[in-house]
């Protein structure tokens, strides 16, 4: 079984964690932007029944 030989430094650990958090932040911003676009009706890349969407928003 593979075992690390030395302890990972704090700097490397923090850099990896910061990278992971930045990726998550970017994905969250994309999801929020997409949701806003769909709700305002300005998105052209989706094909859906507008009555179903309106009913879902009202409920």
UniProtKB/Swiss-Prot annotation:
The keyword 4Fe-4S does not apply. One of its GO terms (cellular component) is large ribosomal subunit. Pfam families: Ribosomal_L32p. GO terms for biological process: translation. This is Large ribosomal subunit protein bL32c. It is found in: Plastid, Chloroplast. Keywords: Chloroplast, Plastid, Ribonucleoprotein, Ribosomal protein. InterPro entries: Ribosomal_bL32 (IPR002677), Ribosomal_bL32_plant/cyanobact (IPR044958), Ribosomal_zn-bd (IPR011332). Residues 1-19 have a biased composition (Basic residues). Belongs to the bacterial ribosomal protein bL32 family. One of its GO terms (molecular function) is structural constituent of ribosome. Residues 1-24 are annotated as: Disordered. HAMAP family: Ribosomal_bL32.
């Amino acid at each position: 079984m593979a075992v690390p030989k030395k302890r990972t430094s704090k700097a490397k650990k923090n850099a990896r964690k910061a990278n992971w958090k930045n990726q998550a932040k970017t994905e969250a911003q994309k999801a929020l932007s997409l949701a806003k676009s769909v709700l305002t009706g300005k998105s052209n890349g989706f094909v859906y029944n507008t009555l179903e969407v309106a009913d879902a928003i009202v409920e």
